[in-house]
C-alpha cells in the first residue's frame, strides 16, 4: 500500500515534489509512538539488566587488579558521599526537563486558543497563586522548532535516544571488563538472585540493582546528558537563556560528583556524554516523530494505539517548514498564496 504525498516548500511557489510513500514509511500516530516506545525502552532496560549480570560476573578481581590510572581521578580528592549528589542533580535535571516540556505543552494549547488548564483555583489565598505557578503560560516569542505537537515529539526524542544508547551500552559493558574504581566495588557483592536483580534494574533503571563492572560507559552520564540537551533545545520557547544557564551549571557539577565519588573513570563520562548527545541530534525533531526505521521496531506491536493516522489521506498535503536559525521568531510561516 502506498500513499500519494504532495509537499509544498514554504516561501516558494512550486511543489518540491511528489512521491509514493510505502506502507512501512508511513508515520504512526504520535500518541502511538509515545506509548510503544515506552514499552521498547522498558525492554531495553531489561536487556541492560541481563548485561549487568554478565559485567558483574566478569569484572576483574579487585584484589588482583588495581584501578586504572586516571588523570582526573588522581587530581580530584575522593568524597564518597558525593555519589548522592549525583542522584540529586539527576532529579533536578529531569525535573527541569519535565517542567520545560509541560510548559511548552501549555504554550501550544494557548496558541491554539484552547482554554487554560486550572486546578483547585477556588482554594482561598493560595489557589490562584498555585495555578499561576503550575499552569501559567510562558512565551519568549522564540520558536526553535515548530510548535505543533512539540510535547509528544519531545517525548519521542527522549524515549528513542535513551533506548538506542541503552542497547549500545549493554553490548559495551559485556564486551570489555574494566577493573573497579576505588569505590564500594572494591568489595563486590555476589548476585545471588539474578532474576530479582534484573527486575530491580527495570524498576529503578539500574540504580537499585547490584551493578559493579558496568563502567564503560556511564549510565548516570547518559541520563544527565539527555536531560541537559532536551532542556537546552526546548527551553527557548519559554525564556531565551535562563534555563540554559541553570542546566549548564548543573551538568559539570554532576560530572564532578561522579568523579569525586569514584563511580566512574573519566573516559566513561566523556564517551557517554558524546554518544548520548550525538544520538539525540541524529534523531531530529520531526513532525512525523521518530525516523521511519525506528518506527519499524514498534509497528508490529498490536497494542497500544493504532497503526494509522485517521486524517492521513491519499492527497494529504505535507508542509515543509524551513527553520534556518535556532532562535527564529517565527518557525511556522503561513503558506504563500498561489
Curated annotation (Swiss-Prot):
Its EC number is 2.7.8.-. The keyword Membrane applies. It is a multi-pass membrane protein. The keyword Transmembrane helix applies. InterPro entries: Sphingomyelin_synth-like, Sphingomyelin_synth-like_dom. One of its GO terms (cellular component) is ciliary pocket. One of its GO terms (molecular function) is ceramide cholinephosphotransferase activity. It is found in: Membrane. Residues 58-87, 138-152, 211-222 are extracellular. Its main location: membrane. PANTHER family: SPHINGOMYELIN SYNTHASE-RELATED PROTEIN 1, SPHINGOMYELIN SYNTHETASE. This is Phosphatidylinositol:ceramide inositolphosphotransferase. It comes from Leishmania major.
